[in-house]
Regions:
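Active-site-proximal beta-strand/loop segments in catalytic clefts of secreted hydrolases
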Residues: 125-128, 150-154, 178-179, 215-220, ...
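Extracellular adhesion/carbohydrate-binding repeat motifs centered on closely spaced tryptophans
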Residues: 1-118
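Residue-level detector of anion-binding/catalytic polar loops
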Residues: 146, 173, 233, 240, ...
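Active-site beta->alpha N-cap acidic-glycine motif
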Residues: 109-185, 191-198, 202-204, 211-212, ...
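C-terminal domain-boundary segment and adjacent tail
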Residues: 142-143, 156-157, 274-323
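Alpha-helical scaffold elements lining the catalytic groove of polysaccharide deacetylases
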Residues: 162, 182-207, 221-264, 275-278
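Glycine-centered loop/turn motifs
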Residues: 73-74, 93-94, 263, 305-311
Length: 323
């Protein structure tokens, strides 16, 4: 992972003086993680680190400040580079919202302050997967683009095994759009939750036991009680292509390219052949215009927004993100 590092017990030996240090516990400088990292004692069940420094577990990289403590919830300067550690002590990579600011960390966790996330949009696809989803994934993969798929459980049963592992492999985000697309305002809260739970269980079969990270209510309709109980962010949109209505390739292309702006969440449906065909033009043209096509979580983080369960988001435009 790091130049000159020596891998041992899934840990990494860094600077020679690290092992000699004894470090006192300190609280993080800021509760939201925007200040200097705190230093926390390892749980009593954890063995002491024979070699403090970078360590690895199945959840990610973390840094042992001495044999029994580690960095947590904030920034740390290590060997001249800036890193950020979350509330569990794991090192950040990619885009993270920290103190209301989007911060980018490379694959080795090093903060890259010059990375610009201002030209991003999120393509989102509802009601799939379907017979055309694999072709859409071909297009996304060809151009190094990601999207977020809000899937119906009834279609996951039919097509999930073929496409969900591939979605995850190319960096797409998995969303939940209910099992059968009912109007949630016509259901009880328990019945609405059951719609999403069924779909999560189906998605998890093809995603290492993990369900969706975001949800979208069918027709955009919900009740306050269901929204408060859903346990994840609710994602709406600010560009509706009406692809389900027009079913016309050129109309889809125009609907996106004539109105797109940074921070947009674009609504489409991968169950329609015309939609997937139009994406063969839309995706490379957006990239040609300088846009990055990213997932919902990445778009939010790059705009300094930490998505919250039970909140609804329409797009990310300099603070106008949710209602």
């Amino acid at each position: 992972k790091f130049a000159g590092a020596q891998l041992a017990k899934k840990g990494i030996v860094l600077s020679n003086d690290t092992a000699a240090k004894t470090v006192s516990e300190t609280a993080p400088e800021a509760e939201d993680g925007s200040g200097n990292a705190g230093i926390k004692k390892l749980a009593e069940t954890m063995p002491p680190n024979e070699t403090p420094g970078w360590q690895y577990s199945s959840s990610g990289w973390w840094y042992a400040t001495d044999a029994t403590t580690y960095y947590v919830n904030g920034w740390a300067d290590i060997d001249g580079n800036q890193y950020h550690f979350d509330s569990n002590g794991y090192m950040a990579t990619g885009w993270k919202a920290i103190g209301g600011k989007g911060c980018y960390f490379d694959d080795q966790g090093v903060y890259q302050p010059d990375r610009n996330g201002s030209m991003m949009v999120a393509l989102t696809f509802d009601d799939g997967p379907g017979v055309y989803t694999s072709t859409l994934l071909d297009t996304l993969e060809q151009y190094g683009a990601q999207a977020t798929f809000f899937m119906l459980g009834s279609n996951v049963e039919k097509y999930g095994a073929d496409v969900i592992p591939r979605m995850a492999a190319i960096g797409c985000e998995l969303g939940n759009h209910s099992y059968a697309h009912p109007n949630m305002k016509e259901l009880s809260t328990d019945d609405g939750l059951a719609q999403f739970q069924m779909t999560d269980d189906l998605i998890a079969q093809y995603n290492n036991g993990q369900g969706a990270t975001v949800i979208r209510f069918p027709y955009g309709n919900s009740t306050d009680e269901l929204l408060a109980s859903i346990g994840r962010p609710s994602i709406m949109w600010d560009v509706d292509t009406l692809d389900w209505q027009t079913k016309n390739v050129q109309a889809n292309i125009s609907a996106v390219l004539d109105s797109v702006s940074p921070g947009d969440i674009i609504l489409m449906h991968d169950i329609h052949e015309t939609t997937v065909e139009s994406c063969a033009t839309i995706v490379p043209e957006l990239i040609n215009r300088g846009y990055e096509l990213v997932t919902i979580h990445t778009l939010a983080a790059a705009n300094g927004v930490d998505l919250a369960a039970g909140e609804t988001y329409y797009g990310f435009h300099g603070g106008t993100t949710n209602e």
